[in-house]
Amino acid sequence: MSALTPASEVILRHSDEFIARHVLFAGDLQDALPAQFDAAGVRVHTNQYHHWQLLSNTLEENVQFGLLATAETLAACDTLIYYWPKSKQEAQFQLANLLSILPVGTDIFVVGENRSGVRSAEEMLADFAQLAKIDSARRCGLYHGRLDKQPEFDADAWWESYQVGSVTVKTLPGVFSRDSLDSGSHLLLSTFNEPFKGSVLDVGCGAGVLASVLAQQSPKIKWTLSDVSAAAIEASRATLAVNNIEAQVIASNVYSDIKGRFEMIISNPPFHDGIQTSLTAAEMLIRGATAHLHVGGKLRIVANSFLPYPALLDAAFGSHEVLAQNGRFKVYQATVGRPPRDPKKKR
């Protein structure tokens, strides 16, 4: 059995409740509990591609990855187990979508760590379900209620936008830097002083702001953007479209679905998975970069100054340089060198 999060351990304290139920798991699910869950039926809707990868081999067509849940995925489900995410707006968006499809009378279980803000679930859903706290353990809260009324849901109403110079950035709940350009990305963009061309991969693209701003400066770049978040993927596509920029945007867990090599990889890599601190994605980004860069290709990333990336860069590339820094962030660059010549081979 794989390791379970505290929230899943709380759910298992009530496992007898679910044996005869047709359960839908959704929200910030970060483990394989659905694959080993004892219920009459189990389905999963996830907005995170790496969570889909974790579950798809076992649950096959019963796990769906995407921005919006569909009636087909939710068909026959009589119980929702929702894992509360870090972002309250993301919870509002996802629950409005799910509860607009699930039938009245559906049992709703909301679980999350106390520090995630799960306490606000009662007030958020008050017009549609009367939730009550039924358990508190492992620094988590578990709430239960029954759907009394379906909310109205219009996905288009959740879009927002802001400007970065002449670039319009389209965003959705749960996307990094939803309201404005973050200071780390601003510092990273400041290091691109001259136009350049070639193939560039943006890992963890968020709303597509890096590619869209740099495309204004260097229109000959061939862009590939990737993210694990379905909301980020859709936001990037919308940002690129409104700014008339052509690019490939794909779901990928760092390099899992990336093909080919690039002249440059750029990233403002996350160091959280939900509310948990995690350097896994950044470590995968750095360690795998040389396999996805041409000789002479560069990895350029921005990160909080306290994160231990210099040692990772030196281990992967042999060296690195700091292109810019301020009180909080540093921009690192590492270059793929030519492999040493084999003296046994004839020239």
From Swiss-Prot:
Protein name per Swiss-Prot or TrEMBL: Ribosomal RNA small subunit methyltransferase C
A Pfam family annotated for this UniProt entry: MTS_N
GO annotation, cellular component aspect: cytoplasm
E.C. number(s) listed in UniProt: 2.1.1.172
NCBIfam families, A to Z: PRK09489.1
UniProt family annotation: Belongs to the methyltransferase superfamily. RsmC family.
Alphabetized GO MF terms: 16S rRNA (guanine(1207)-N(2))-methyltransferase activity; nucleic acid binding
Complex formation: Monomer.
InterPro entries found in the cross-reference section: DNA_methylase_N6_adenine_CS (IPR002052), Mtase_sm_N (IPR013675), rRNA_ssu_MeTfrase_C (IPR023543), RsmC/RlmG (IPR046977), SAM-dependent_MTases_sf (IPR029063), Small_mtfrase_dom (IPR007848)
Subcellular location: Cytoplasm
Main location: cytoplasm
Record field: catalytic activity: guanosine(1207) in 16S rRNA + S-adenosyl-L-methionine = N(2)-methylguanosine(1207) in 16S rRNA + S-adenosyl-L-homocysteine + H(+)
Enzyme class (EC, first level): transferase
Job of this protein: Specifically methylates the guanine in position 1207 of 16S rRNA in the 30S particle.
Organism field: Yersinia pseudotuberculosis serotype IB (strain PB1/+)
Keywords assigned: Cytoplasm, Methyltransferase, rRNA processing, S-adenosyl-L-methionine, Transferase
Cited HAMAP family: 16SrRNA_methyltr_C
